[in-house]
């Protein structure tokens, strides 16, 4: 590996499964300590146990759409690891419908998890990031920190039937570009990775086991129609869905020193697919 993240500490939200778990695995393999967060405490423990060095991993379960939880995640990370260098805002889910069938609650839920949650987490981390940077610069050191927000080609291109999801994923791009300009003076790279269709429970067949979730009293169906999956594969230049490991590779680039002079950008990791 052409770089090491030894001595760095990361937060990865939505890391109980799928892409989030794969991101955490990449970061730990590169030498970082990682705080995992997810709604599902059982899946969090599974993630921790699956990593190569669980001694450098801690977990904090909690619903990030609770206004108090993002700050708790940041504080737990600082209390455990005494530093914070990398934040990956990965948590999310899809609750889909066309606009005329989308309730205010459904639309707001998509904004809350995909836009408001990253905002709150980054706001909670801002004091530590700024003070650490000021101390480092006063000593003549440049220490780069990293923020990676997860978006989607639904946010960059729009996608019929995903009015809430697409809006939240588009909004986080604006957050990314604005924070890149606000935090550049503190040596923070703020970028986004936009995924196409990756092999997670969000794109499994509708009738597959586990193709649903419970959220705030609602039973939410996940996945897509099998015929649509075939259509998407045919439209994708690479002819297949991506794997969580491939998705995590794109995120790792933005977490690494290889991206030290890249900020405010959106990297699409979708096999060439656009809606």
Predicted features along the sequence, with ranges:
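Residue(s) in the substrate-gating loop at a strand-loop-helix junction
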Residues: 152
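Short C-terminal tail/terminal secondary-structure segment
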Residues: 2-4, 157, 234, 250-253, ...
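Substrate-binding pocket helix/loop in short-chain dehydrogenase/reductase
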Residues: 98-99, 103-111, 232
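Canonical Rossmann dinucleotide-binding motif of NAD(H)/NADP(H)-dependent dehydrogenases/reductases
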Residues: 3-35
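Alpha-helical segment proximal to the catalytic Tyr-Lys
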Residues: 127, 181-182, 260
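Short, small/polar-rich loop/turn modules that mediate ligand/substrate recognition or access, typified
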Residues: 83, 184-189, 262-264
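Active-site helix of classical SDR
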Residues: 122, 168, 176
